Every structure is written in C-alpha cells, then in structure tokens.
Regions:
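P-loop NTPase motor core of the ASCE superfamily
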Residues: 91-95, 105, 279, 302-431
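Sensor-1/coupling segment of RecA-like P-loop NTPase cores
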Residues: 284-305
C-alpha cells in the first residue's frame, strides 16, 4: 500500500489545482507515520490532517447542517450494522434510526443547529434532561423564534417522543436505548474522546471533506483498533461515509467547485465496509475518485456485511486486483471464476497384463504366468478447467508474489504471476 500512497501524494504535489485530495484509513494505527514522511518529502505537510485523540483537529461527525436528520440517522444505523452482523431482526435498528432522527431535530432546535453525541445521549437517555430542553423549546416557540419548517419539525418531534417513544413498554424502550448507546457511549465514556469528537462549536476545525476536495487536503485517521475497538470502527466508517457523500455531490454540482482527482485508501478494509460501498464504487469513477483497498479475504468482507450479493458487487467494481496467497476457499473459488477456464491437455497412462494360464510355485511361493502379454495404453484428451487451480493459490504463491488482474486503461491484461519488491527492501523511490 505504501508505494501507491507515495505515488498519489507525489502526483502534481506542487500544482494547487491538480494535487490529489485523499482519505486514508488504517485501523492498526501505524500508517499515518509513513504518510507524514511522504508529505514531508513532497512538501505537502500543510495539506496533512491527522484525526486522532488529543490531536490538532477536532471533528464532530454529527455537525452536518446541510444534511437532513433522517440522513444522519441512517448513517448511524449503517454504522450500527457493523456491530450487528448476524442480526436478522431489523425492527430494533429501524426504531433506533427513527428515534435518532427525531432527537437530532430537537437538538438542532434548542441548540442553535449544533448536534453532538453527548447531547443525543442525554436527550434520549435522561428524561429530566429531555424535560428541561422541552421548556427551552416551549419558550422559544412562544416567542415566535422558529420559522414554518422549524415549527413543523418541533411539533412532529415532540409528538413522536410524547405519544410514541415515551409510551413504549419498558422492555421495548430499554432494547431501543441499548442499541443507541452502543454508539453514543463510545463518545462520552472518556474525556479525551468527548473533547475530540463532541467539542463545542467554536473549537471545531475539521468540518468535513468539502475543503479536502476543494484544496487537495490529505486526511488520515490515527486510531488503533486494539485500543479503541468500537470507536475506531465508528470513526472510520463515518469518515468514509462523509467522504463518499461529498465525492458524489461533485456529480450533482457538475464539478463546479473543483475537478481535481481524489483518492480513498483503506488498509484492513473489511473492518468497516458497509453495504453502501457497492453503490459508491460503481459510480465514483465518474466523480474522478481512485479507490485502493486491502483486505484479508473475501470471506472477511462477507463476515462484516453478511450479504454475498453486496460483496460480489464491491469486488466486481474494483477493476485492478492483486491476489496474494490464500487458504480461503470462498476467495479462491471466486477468483477462479473471475479469471475463467481454458482448454488443458490431459493425458492418462495405463499398463495391463493378461495371462492364459497361471500356476502356483511352491518353490518360490508365488504365482507364475504362462503365455502372458503386457499392453500399455497412453491416451490424451482436451478438457476445460480453471486456468489456476487451488494448489496455485495455497502453495505456489510465495511470499512477495501475487497473481495480477490488471487493466491498461483500455483492456484487461492476461492474468499473470507477479514478483513484488518489498517496500522495506527497496531503497529507491516509487514513481
């Protein structure tokens, strides 16, 4: 992944209009160090934005004034699905999405349009806090503070909370709340996390990816999944969804702001892949987005998404592929089908002996044949079989070799075994 990253950072690095804007995700927490080195080499240090705890940037995933509450709530539901891989009952997640949408409406109305995970958590979980905010909303309403649209949102949200949500039986209410707290608790449990991802409005200095696309910035997430298992997945998935939404807006705006190329680089992609990625990868080429992903196997993707059709859509929308040694049968079979079959020459060799009379020799204690003859048969046939068999993927791909399925821009190059140069052994530059 490092050579690809270096080439993209280097590309037109001194040209403000052409240098590439990027989102780089890595849940192991070491990728950002290499990115910093590349940015220093190619004079792009001012373009680098590192999202990390106690860092220089504060990011609130919920502060999207241009997005409807229902869209934000749906993003949160999409992220919840990362932690509900085998959940066959969608009612609880659908209900949690509805509660979040209405809570976001209320929060925007009493908090001057600013929404944080801390506010969402308190307004949903703490009844006294909800009642206190209701008094503020009533006072603003009586003073004609809201326009017609805001008034409608206010009445619909209050109606939902008073007539439906708060009237649910205790068991149903507790289950819905537990679904919501799986996200909100990750942001309010520690002070460092709270001040980084739910800061006051005046402290926000990373507002999203519009600036990344307009000015060619490089956003890197530095958050180790072993230390912050849930939070790193949530932030990674949210950054990815935020980036994808902004990229696709370029098509709607007909590239009026900027037509620079952008890139999405993701190591350990299976940790935060979502079903919406299949649609993005199928359309992002027109939006001039380069997608570079690394995953352990296709089964890893399937384990996260739990939808084989979606996994196949994601795979088929990624044109260039490098396959390394694998023992995963699902991955191998899918690769074999994609590469196809060819006619192979198969030969068989047999030897047979016929005897008219066989007698037993007591002297040698064995059977002796008389008037026997020996015949040998060699046959050759053409059979259709996979170009690369299972043994090739499990045993014949050595370390630092891969099977390449690549395009030259106009056609697919015949798949072939490639020998790769390890980055840590190569002293030159990748360009």
């Amino acid at each position: 992944m490092y050579p690809f990253t270096q080439q993209l950072i280097k590309y037109k690095s001194n040209n403000f209009e052409k240098k590439i804007g990027m989102l780089i995700l890595d849940v192991k927490g070491n990728y950002y160090k290499q990115v910093k080195k590349f940015c220093k080499i190619y004079n792009r240090e001012e373009d680098l934005i590192i999202i990390e705890l106690n860092g220089n940037y504060k990011y609130n995933p919920l502060h999207k004034p241009n997005l409807k509450p229902s869209v934000l709530a749906n993003r949160l539901k999409t992220i919840l699905l990362l932690f509900s891989k085998n959940n066959t009952e969608s009612f609880w997640l659908d209900k949690a999405e509805q509660v979040l949408a209405e809570a976001i409406k209320l929060c925007r109305l009493y908090n001057d349009g600013y929404v944080t995970f801390n506010e969402l958590h308190k307004i949903i979980m703490v009844n006294d806090y909800y009642l206190d905010k209701l008094k503020i909303l009533r006072e603003k309403f009586n003073n004609n503070y809201y326009n017609h649209t805001e008034t409608y949102d206010l009445l619909s949200s209050i109606t939902f909370f008073e007539k439906e949500f708060l009237n649910l039986d205790p068991r149903t209410l507790s289950i819905i709340k537990s679904e919501i707290t799986r996200i909100t608790n990750s942001f309010i449990g520690e002070y460092d996390i709270l001040k980084t991802f739910s800061p006051p409005l005046e402290e926000l200095n990373f507002l999203g990816f519009q600036d990344v696309l307009e000015n060619g910035k490089i956003v890197v997430l530095n958050m180790n999944i072993s230390e912050y298992a849930i939070l790193s997945k949530i932030i990674s998935a949210y950054l990815k969804l935020d980036f994808q939404s902004e990229v696709m807006m370029r098509l709607a705006n007909n590239f009026q702001i900027s037509n620079r190329s952008v890139a999405f680089i993701s190591d350990e992609y299976h940790e935060y892949c979502t079903e919406t990625d299949s649609n993005f990868f199928s359309q992002s080429r027109e939006a001039k987005c380069i997608n570079i992903l690394a995953t352990q196997s296709y089964t890893s993707l399937l384990n996260t998404i739990n939808n084989q059709a979606t996994v196949k859509m994601i795979i088929q929308n990624l044109i260039n592929k490098l396959w390394f040694r694998s023992d995963d049968i699902f991955t191998i079979e899918d690769i074999q089908k994609q590469i196809g079959k060819e006619d192979k020459e198969k030969s068989s060799h047999s030897i047979s002996e016929n005897a008219q009379k066989t007698v037993f020799s007591y002297l040698t204690n064995s059977l002796n044949s008389k008037n026997s003859n020996i015949s040998e048969t060699i046959s050759t046939s053409i059979q259709t079989d996979f170009i690369y068999d299972t043994k090739f993927f499990t045993q014949e791909l050595e370390n630092f070799t891969a099977l390449g399925f690549l395009s030259d821009g106009s056609k697919i190059i015949p798949p072939q075994k490639l020998k790769l140069i390890p980055y840590f052994l190569y002293k030159g530059g990748f360009s």
